[in-house]
Amino acid sequence: GDTIALTMPTYPAYKNMLKALDINIVEIETTKETNYQPTAELLENSGKKFDGIIITNPSNPTGAMINEETLQDICNWCDNNNVRLISDEAYHGITYETPAQTALVHSKSALVLNTFSKYFALTGWRLGWLITPENMASRIKSLAENLFVSPPTIAQHVALQSFNHMDVLDGYVEQYRTNRDILRARLPELGFGDMSSAQGAFYFY
């Protein structure tokens, strides 16, 4: 079977999902020095072979982000090495310093995942989207029809209405920022000094 690389730490459920699909997994460790995110150099020097890689930007569980130059390098590395990039962008919109860059800017072969559960605050409605290269669209559509048919109509209507209330959603992000700043100031006083930068999402690591 195919082999997918996960850059650690990562969203824990990925392992279970991939194992359920009988996909082999290799792990590539990131560190604070790489901002708990992969780099093209890290992938090149990993010594591991894989057909695809999943990245999360901003990251769950670290809140760390991949800057634009590094993301471009990763996209180029994947294209040059025939590795499918799968970019989980669920936390786009929840950033505190610079906006998160989408892999679509740098790659025509990447798969991009997103959801209405995070920035749009529709957790529980289980609605999201996938952006795929055109040559994969029909196969993914066939797969989707056999897994969940289609999302509920009411969830789609609610999601569309959320675009009319971006000011409210941005207000949520400002509240997340306030909470992050409080924690970033207080946690070191409690002994949690060596933390991730928490540039996005709502996690410290």
Feature roles, as predicted:
Residues 6, 27, 55, 87, ...:
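Hydrophobic residues in well-ordered beta-strands that form the structural core
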Residues 30-98:
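Active-site phosphate-binding strand-loop segment of PLP-dependent enzymes
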Residues 2, 23, 80-84, 108:
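A short helix->loop->beta-strand "cap" motif at the edges of active sites that frequently abuts
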Residues 160, 176-187, 194-205:
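Conserved glycine-rich beta-strand-loop-beta hairpin in the small C-terminal domain of fold type I
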Residues 105-139, 151-154:
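Active-site PLP attachment segment
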Residues 1-18:
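Conserved PLP-anchoring active-site segment centered on the Schiff-base-forming lysine
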Residues 134-139, 153-174, 186-189:
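Amphipathic alpha-helix from the class-I
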